[in-house]
Amino acid sequence: MARMKKALVMAVAAVAAAGVALAIAGGALAAERTQITVKDSGEFPESITSTKDGAVIFGSISKGIIYKAAPGSATAEPWIQPSSGNLKNVLGVFADERARTLWVCSIVRPVPGQPEPAPDTALKSFNLKTGAFKKSYDFPDHKGTCNDIAVAKDGTIYATETAEGKVLRLKPGASKLEVWASDPLLASADGIAVLADGAIYVNGVRTGNLVRIAVKPDGSAGTMMKLETSRPLSRPDGMRSVGPNTILLAEGEGRADEVVVNGEKAEVRTLRGDFKDQPTAVTLVGKTVFVLEAKLNYLNDEKLKGQDPGPFRATAVAYTPSKQ
Protein backbone atom coordinates (compact mmCIF):
# COMPACT_ATOMS: atom_id res chain seq x y z
CA MET A 1 0.00 0.00 0.00
CA ALA A 2 2.81 2.37 0.92
CA ARG A 3 4.47 1.65 -2.40
CA MET A 4 1.25 2.42 -4.29
CA LYS A 5 0.89 5.75 -2.46
CA LYS A 6 4.50 6.64 -3.23
CA ALA A 7 4.01 5.81 -6.91
CA LEU A 8 0.84 7.90 -7.01
CA VAL A 9 2.60 10.87 -5.41
CA MET A 10 5.45 10.61 -7.91
CA ALA A 11 3.04 10.44 -10.83
CA VAL A 12 1.17 13.53 -9.64
CA ALA A 13 4.49 15.36 -9.19
CA ALA A 14 5.55 14.43 -12.73
CA VAL A 15 2.29 15.74 -14.18
CA ALA A 16 2.65 18.97 -12.19
CA ALA A 17 6.23 19.42 -13.38
CA ALA A 18 5.15 18.90 -16.97
CA GLY A 19 2.45 21.50 -16.51
CA VAL A 20 4.94 23.99 -15.12
CA ALA A 21 7.29 23.34 -18.06
CA LEU A 22 4.49 23.92 -20.54
CA ALA A 23 3.46 27.09 -18.74
CA ILE A 24 7.02 28.39 -18.84
CA ALA A 25 7.36 27.58 -22.53
CA GLY A 26 4.05 29.25 -23.28
CA GLY A 27 5.09 32.28 -21.29
CA ALA A 28 8.35 32.52 -23.21
CA LEU A 29 6.51 32.47 -26.51
CA ALA A 30 4.03 35.06 -25.26
CA ALA A 31 6.87 37.26 -24.11
CA GLU A 32 8.66 37.18 -27.48
CA ARG A 33 10.86 40.25 -27.91
CA THR A 34 9.34 43.20 -29.74
CA GLN A 35 12.40 45.40 -29.13
CA ILE A 36 15.92 45.06 -27.80
CA THR A 37 17.19 48.10 -25.91
CA VAL A 38 20.88 48.82 -25.35
CA LYS A 39 21.57 49.38 -21.66
CA ASP A 40 23.66 52.55 -21.92
CA SER A 41 23.38 56.14 -23.14
CA GLY A 42 24.96 57.96 -26.06
CA GLU A 43 26.44 54.79 -27.53
CA PHE A 44 25.17 55.22 -31.13
CA PRO A 45 25.17 51.62 -32.36
CA GLU A 46 25.46 51.41 -36.17
CA SER A 47 25.52 47.65 -36.78
CA ILE A 48 24.01 44.47 -35.36
CA THR A 49 24.50 40.76 -35.84
CA SER A 50 23.07 37.62 -34.27
CA THR A 51 23.74 33.95 -33.58
CA LYS A 52 21.46 30.98 -34.18
CA ASP A 53 20.60 30.70 -30.48
CA GLY A 54 19.02 34.18 -30.60
CA ALA A 55 21.76 36.32 -29.08
CA VAL A 56 21.98 39.78 -30.68
CA ILE A 57 25.20 41.82 -30.74
CA PHE A 58 25.51 45.60 -31.18
CA GLY A 59 28.48 47.85 -31.96
CA SER A 60 28.98 51.45 -30.79
CA ILE A 61 30.30 54.36 -32.83
CA SER A 62 30.82 56.76 -29.95
CA LYS A 63 31.99 54.46 -27.13
CA GLY A 64 33.68 51.56 -28.90
CA ILE A 65 31.85 49.10 -26.65
CA ILE A 66 30.26 45.94 -28.01
CA TYR A 67 26.93 45.00 -26.41
CA LYS A 68 25.18 41.65 -26.30
CA ALA A 69 21.59 40.64 -25.63
CA ALA A 70 21.35 37.05 -24.43
CA PRO A 71 18.90 34.74 -26.25
CA GLY A 72 15.39 35.92 -25.45
CA SER A 73 16.58 39.01 -23.58
CA ALA A 74 15.16 42.43 -24.45
CA THR A 75 18.25 44.20 -23.07
CA ALA A 76 21.74 44.37 -24.56
CA GLU A 77 24.43 44.68 -21.90
CA PRO A 78 28.06 45.83 -22.30
CA TRP A 79 30.07 42.77 -23.32
CA ILE A 80 33.42 43.73 -24.88
CA GLN A 81 35.18 46.88 -23.67
CA PRO A 82 37.32 49.13 -25.93
CA SER A 83 40.45 48.16 -24.01
CA SER A 84 40.06 44.66 -25.40
CA GLY A 85 41.79 44.70 -28.77
CA ASN A 86 42.18 48.49 -28.72
CA LEU A 87 38.74 49.15 -30.17
CA LYS A 88 38.08 52.72 -31.29
CA ASN A 89 34.80 53.65 -32.99
CA VAL A 90 32.92 50.48 -33.93
CA LEU A 91 30.97 50.20 -37.17
CA GLY A 92 30.26 46.75 -38.64
CA VAL A 93 29.91 43.63 -36.50
CA PHE A 94 29.45 40.12 -37.92
CA ALA A 95 28.99 36.79 -36.13
CA ASP A 96 30.86 34.05 -37.98
CA GLU A 97 29.56 30.93 -36.24
CA ARG A 98 31.53 28.44 -38.33
CA ALA A 99 34.79 30.10 -37.29
CA ARG A 100 33.47 30.87 -33.77
CA THR A 101 34.53 34.45 -34.40
CA LEU A 102 33.02 37.91 -34.05
CA TRP A 103 34.42 40.23 -36.73
CA VAL A 104 34.45 43.94 -35.93
CA CYS A 105 35.20 47.07 -37.97
CA SER A 106 37.13 49.60 -35.86
CA ILE A 107 37.91 53.12 -37.09
CA VAL A 108 38.92 56.49 -35.66
CA ARG A 109 36.11 58.95 -36.27
CA PRO A 110 37.15 62.60 -36.71
CA VAL A 111 35.45 65.02 -34.33
CA PRO A 112 34.48 68.39 -35.86
CA GLY A 113 36.45 71.26 -34.35
CA GLN A 114 39.24 69.03 -33.08
CA PRO A 115 42.62 68.14 -34.63
CA GLU A 116 42.55 65.34 -37.19
CA PRO A 117 43.34 62.09 -35.34
CA ALA A 118 45.91 59.61 -36.60
CA PRO A 119 44.20 56.94 -38.72
CA ASP A 120 43.77 53.55 -37.08
CA THR A 121 41.39 51.48 -39.19
CA ALA A 122 41.36 47.74 -38.63
CA LEU A 123 39.30 44.58 -38.86
CA LYS A 124 39.38 42.86 -35.48
CA SER A 125 38.41 39.37 -34.37
CA PHE A 126 37.05 38.15 -31.04
CA ASN A 127 35.97 34.80 -29.65
CA LEU A 128 32.26 34.61 -30.43
CA LYS A 129 31.45 32.76 -27.20
CA THR A 130 33.65 34.49 -24.62
CA GLY A 131 34.34 37.86 -26.25
CA ALA A 132 38.09 37.38 -25.79
CA PHE A 133 40.25 39.32 -28.26
CA LYS A 134 41.91 37.20 -30.95
CA LYS A 135 43.66 39.30 -33.59
CA SER A 136 43.72 42.65 -35.41
CA TYR A 137 44.19 43.11 -39.16
CA ASP A 138 45.16 46.64 -40.17
CA PHE A 139 43.75 48.32 -43.25
CA PRO A 140 46.50 49.46 -45.68
CA ASP A 141 48.35 52.38 -44.05
CA HIS A 142 45.73 52.16 -41.24
CA LYS A 143 43.50 54.35 -43.44
CA GLY A 144 39.95 54.16 -44.73
CA THR A 145 36.54 53.40 -43.28
CA CYS A 146 35.93 49.75 -42.48
CA ASN A 147 32.15 49.66 -42.64
CA ASP A 148 30.70 46.16 -42.81
CA ILE A 149 31.64 42.51 -43.16
CA ALA A 150 30.55 39.31 -44.89
CA VAL A 151 31.98 35.79 -44.90
CA ALA A 152 32.09 33.44 -47.90
CA LYS A 153 31.57 29.68 -47.79
CA ASP A 154 35.31 29.02 -47.95
CA GLY A 155 35.92 31.26 -44.93
CA THR A 156 37.18 34.28 -46.86
CA ILE A 157 36.34 37.54 -45.09
CA TYR A 158 35.20 40.54 -47.12
CA ALA A 159 34.96 44.08 -45.69
CA THR A 160 33.72 47.27 -47.32
CA GLU A 161 35.78 50.46 -47.31
CA THR A 162 33.46 53.43 -47.71
CA ALA A 163 35.74 56.45 -48.15
CA GLU A 164 37.30 55.29 -51.43
CA GLY A 165 34.80 52.65 -52.53
CA LYS A 166 36.66 49.38 -52.06
CA VAL A 167 36.21 45.82 -50.89
CA LEU A 168 39.05 44.28 -48.88
CA ARG A 169 39.68 40.58 -48.47
CA LEU A 170 41.20 38.37 -45.79
CA LYS A 171 41.88 34.89 -47.15
CA PRO A 172 41.72 31.90 -44.79
CA GLY A 173 45.00 31.67 -42.91
CA ALA A 174 46.24 35.04 -44.21
CA SER A 175 47.89 37.53 -41.88
CA LYS A 176 47.08 40.66 -43.90
CA LEU A 177 44.10 42.29 -45.55
CA GLU A 178 44.36 43.09 -49.24
CA VAL A 179 42.35 45.33 -51.57
CA TRP A 180 40.20 42.90 -53.55
CA ALA A 181 38.02 45.26 -55.62
CA SER A 182 38.03 48.99 -56.35
CA ASP A 183 35.79 50.71 -58.89
CA PRO A 184 33.64 53.86 -59.32
CA LEU A 185 30.58 51.57 -59.10
CA LEU A 186 31.60 50.90 -55.49
CA ALA A 187 31.57 54.57 -54.45
CA SER A 188 30.42 54.88 -50.80
CA ALA A 189 30.50 51.08 -50.40
CA ASP A 190 28.59 50.14 -47.26
CA GLY A 191 26.50 46.99 -46.85
CA ILE A 192 27.89 43.67 -48.08
CA ALA A 193 26.56 40.13 -48.44
CA VAL A 194 27.45 36.82 -50.09
CA LEU A 195 24.78 34.75 -51.86
CA ALA A 196 24.63 31.13 -53.00
CA ASP A 197 26.04 32.00 -56.43
CA GLY A 198 29.29 32.86 -54.65
CA ALA A 199 29.20 36.48 -55.80
CA ILE A 200 29.74 39.43 -53.48
CA TYR A 201 26.94 42.01 -53.26
CA VAL A 202 27.72 45.57 -52.18
CA ASN A 203 25.53 48.66 -51.85
CA GLY A 204 26.48 52.33 -51.95
CA VAL A 205 25.02 54.38 -49.11
CA ARG A 206 25.19 57.62 -51.11
CA THR A 207 24.77 56.29 -54.66
CA GLY A 208 21.93 53.86 -53.98
CA ASN A 209 23.73 51.27 -56.11
CA LEU A 210 23.42 47.54 -55.56
CA VAL A 211 26.43 45.92 -57.21
CA ARG A 212 27.28 42.28 -57.86
CA ILE A 213 30.96 41.27 -58.06
CA ALA A 214 31.66 37.85 -59.50
CA VAL A 215 34.42 35.77 -57.93
CA LYS A 216 36.80 34.10 -60.39
CA PRO A 217 37.99 30.51 -59.84
CA ASP A 218 41.31 31.85 -58.52
CA GLY A 219 39.45 34.02 -55.98
CA SER A 220 40.11 37.36 -57.67
CA ALA A 221 37.34 39.85 -58.43
CA GLY A 222 35.54 39.22 -61.71
CA THR A 223 32.83 41.06 -63.61
CA MET A 224 31.17 43.89 -61.71
CA MET A 225 27.56 44.82 -62.46
CA LYS A 226 25.05 47.32 -61.11
CA LEU A 227 21.76 45.47 -60.61
CA GLU A 228 18.45 46.90 -61.73
CA THR A 229 16.32 47.30 -58.60
CA SER A 230 12.51 47.30 -58.79
CA ARG A 231 12.55 50.69 -57.07
CA PRO A 232 15.34 53.12 -56.13
CA LEU A 233 17.19 52.47 -52.88
CA SER A 234 17.53 55.46 -50.55
CA ARG A 235 20.67 55.41 -48.39
CA PRO A 236 21.02 51.62 -48.37
CA ASP A 237 23.10 50.43 -45.44
CA GLY A 238 23.55 47.13 -43.61
CA MET A 239 22.72 43.90 -45.46
CA ARG A 240 22.47 40.26 -44.43
CA SER A 241 21.99 37.22 -46.69
CA VAL A 242 19.07 35.05 -45.54
CA GLY A 243 18.53 32.70 -48.48
CA PRO A 244 20.17 31.47 -51.69
CA ASN A 245 19.31 34.70 -53.52
CA THR A 246 17.74 36.79 -50.76
CA ILE A 247 19.13 39.71 -48.79
CA LEU A 248 17.69 41.74 -45.92
CA LEU A 249 18.54 45.44 -46.20
CA ALA A 250 18.22 48.58 -44.08
CA GLU A 251 17.53 51.89 -45.83
CA GLY A 252 18.48 55.03 -43.94
CA GLU A 253 15.37 56.82 -45.15
CA GLY A 254 13.21 54.65 -42.91
CA ARG A 255 12.75 51.21 -44.44
CA ALA A 256 13.66 47.59 -43.84
CA ASP A 257 13.53 45.50 -47.01
CA GLU A 258 13.76 42.06 -48.50
CA VAL A 259 15.75 42.01 -51.75
CA VAL A 260 15.46 39.00 -54.06
CA VAL A 261 18.12 38.81 -56.77
CA ASN A 262 17.24 37.21 -60.09
CA GLY A 263 19.84 37.57 -62.81
CA GLU A 264 20.51 41.24 -63.48
CA LYS A 265 17.45 42.38 -61.52
CA ALA A 266 16.61 42.72 -57.83
CA GLU A 267 13.06 42.79 -56.50
CA VAL A 268 12.76 45.06 -53.45
CA ARG A 269 9.93 44.39 -50.98
CA THR A 270 9.44 46.76 -48.06
CA LEU A 271 8.89 44.87 -44.82
CA ARG A 272 8.28 48.05 -42.85
CA GLY A 273 8.63 51.62 -44.04
CA ASP A 274 7.85 53.95 -41.14
CA PHE A 275 11.08 54.01 -39.12
CA LYS A 276 11.90 57.54 -37.96
CA ASP A 277 15.48 57.29 -36.68
CA GLN A 278 17.65 56.12 -39.58
CA PRO A 279 17.74 52.34 -39.89
CA THR A 280 21.32 51.23 -40.54
CA ALA A 281 21.36 47.49 -39.86
CA VAL A 282 19.27 44.32 -39.84
CA THR A 283 19.67 40.79 -38.53
CA LEU A 284 17.41 37.74 -38.67
CA VAL A 285 16.51 35.72 -35.56
CA GLY A 286 14.14 32.87 -36.37
CA LYS A 287 11.22 34.47 -38.19
CA THR A 288 11.95 37.96 -36.86
CA VAL A 289 14.03 40.71 -38.42
CA PHE A 290 15.56 43.07 -35.88
CA VAL A 291 16.02 46.55 -37.34
CA LEU A 292 18.49 48.93 -35.71
CA GLU A 293 17.91 52.69 -35.79
CA ALA A 294 21.21 54.55 -35.33
CA LYS A 295 19.95 58.14 -34.88
CA LEU A 296 23.10 59.40 -36.61
CA ASN A 297 21.54 62.84 -37.09
CA TYR A 298 22.32 63.44 -33.40
CA LEU A 299 25.99 63.05 -34.30
CA ASN A 300 25.99 64.88 -37.63
CA ASP A 301 23.32 67.61 -37.40
CA GLU A 302 24.60 70.77 -35.69
CA LYS A 303 21.08 71.53 -34.45
CA LEU A 304 20.85 68.19 -32.65
CA LYS A 305 24.40 67.73 -31.38
CA GLY A 306 24.55 67.60 -27.61
CA GLN A 307 20.88 66.72 -27.26
CA ASP A 308 19.79 63.46 -25.68
CA PRO A 309 18.97 60.96 -28.46
CA GLY A 310 17.17 58.72 -25.98
CA PRO A 311 17.61 54.95 -25.80
CA PHE A 312 18.86 52.98 -28.77
CA ARG A 313 16.81 49.97 -29.85
CA ALA A 314 16.45 47.26 -32.44
CA THR A 315 12.80 46.72 -33.35
CA ALA A 316 11.29 43.35 -34.27
CA VAL A 317 9.57 42.95 -37.63
CA ALA A 318 7.83 39.67 -38.51
CA TYR A 319 9.32 38.10 -41.62
CA THR A 320 7.89 35.60 -44.08
CA PRO A 321 10.17 35.06 -47.09
CA SER A 322 8.73 35.74 -50.52
CA LYS A 323 7.67 32.72 -52.54
CA GLN A 324 10.06 32.16 -55.42
Language-model regions, residue ranges each:
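A short beta-strand motif characteristic of beta-propeller blades
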Residues: E32-V38, T75-S83, A132-F139, K176-D183, ...
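Short loop/turn segments immediately following the C-termini of beta-strands
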Residues: I61, I107-R109, T162-A163, V205, ...
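Asp-box/WD-like beta-propeller blade repeats and closely related beta-sheet repeat scaffolds
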Residues: P117-D154
